[in-house]
């Protein structure tokens, strides 16, 4: 685990207080960053249905994932085994079966189907179909938008989080120095970004880096008008500007950095 159990318990209590203030009895969090914040789960499985379910009075949240990824939950979270809920592979790509059928059954079995449920209505990977599944499958619940409840709790960082962000910042600095060194006229963009990525993953002698939530962005020349373009096999041109946007990452904590360089 990247944090102590006490850290996770403190986060849970803050979320539950906000839930109480908003009149939410059960929160279903689909945001992958929120799942990590509440449980420690960080497997690369966001593209399938998964969530953390928080009851306003529970001692621990529930981590709900597909069977294939359940090992990641057992390894990476602080939760008791009984609070890791697994849905079978039969729900994957077998319409009309859907993973949310399983989640709805769990909520019914726990007799939570008459509670006020908060949903992250503007969260990535929570589709309109997922919402309809919940609305139709739990007709006796009151559904409401959680309004980025967990995200707002996350805004105030703990000392432990800030320590990780400072480490990520050092990796960002190293990656940016590499970028400025390797971006030169006549160099292929892909070659430059390869060196940048290498630097970001190598990290420092004290701590290694890891993949980031954003690709290294490297728009150059007229591409600078588009901001979010990635490297191609084209070469850098003397007299043109290049925007560098990257982030060092340490234990999933980012510290992004952006700079503009002019060649020549």
Which functions belong to the PLM regions below?
Residues 35-45, 147-152, 156, 187-264:
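Short catalytic-site patches enriched in acidic/histidine residues
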Residues 169-172, 176-179, 189, 197:
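Active-site pocket-lining segments that scaffold enzyme catalytic pockets across diverse folds
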Residues 118-123, 180-189:
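Conserved short loop/turn motifs at secondary-structure junctions
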Residues 1-174:
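A composition/biophysics-driven feature that prefers long, compositionally simple stretches
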């Amino acid at each position: 685990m990247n944090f102590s159990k006490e850290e996770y318990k403190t986060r849970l209590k803050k979320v539950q207080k906000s839930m109480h203030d908003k009149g939410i009895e059960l929160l279903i969090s689909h945001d992958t960053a929120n799942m990590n914040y509440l449980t420690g789960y960080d497997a690369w499985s966001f593209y399938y249905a998964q969530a953390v379910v928080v009851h306003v009075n529970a001692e621990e949240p529930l981590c709900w994932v597909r069977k294939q990824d359940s090992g990641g939950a057992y390894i990476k979270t602080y939760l008791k085994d009984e609070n890791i809920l697994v849905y079978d592979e039969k729900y994957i790509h077998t319409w009309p079966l859907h993973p949310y059928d399983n989640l709805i059954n769990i909520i019914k079995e726990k007799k939570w189907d008459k509670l006020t449920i908060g949903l992250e209505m503007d969260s990535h990977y929570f589709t309109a179909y997922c919402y309809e599944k919940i609305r139709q499958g739990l007709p006796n619940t009151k559904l409401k938008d959680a309004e980025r409840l967990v995200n707002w709790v996350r805004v105030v960082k703990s000392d432990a989080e800030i320590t990780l962000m400072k480490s990520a910042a050092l990796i960002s600095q190293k990656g940016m120095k590499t970028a400025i060194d390797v971006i030169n006229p006549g160099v292929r963009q892909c070659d430059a970004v390869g060196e940048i990525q290498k630097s970001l993953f190598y990290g420092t002698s004290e701590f290694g880096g890891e993949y980031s939530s954003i690709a290294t962005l490297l728009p150059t020349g007229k591409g600078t008008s588009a901001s979010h373009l990635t490297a191609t096999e084209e070469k850098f041109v003397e007299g043109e500007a290049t925007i560098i946007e990257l982030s060092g990452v340490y234990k999933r904590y980012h510290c992004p950095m952006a700079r503009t360089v002019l060649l020549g």
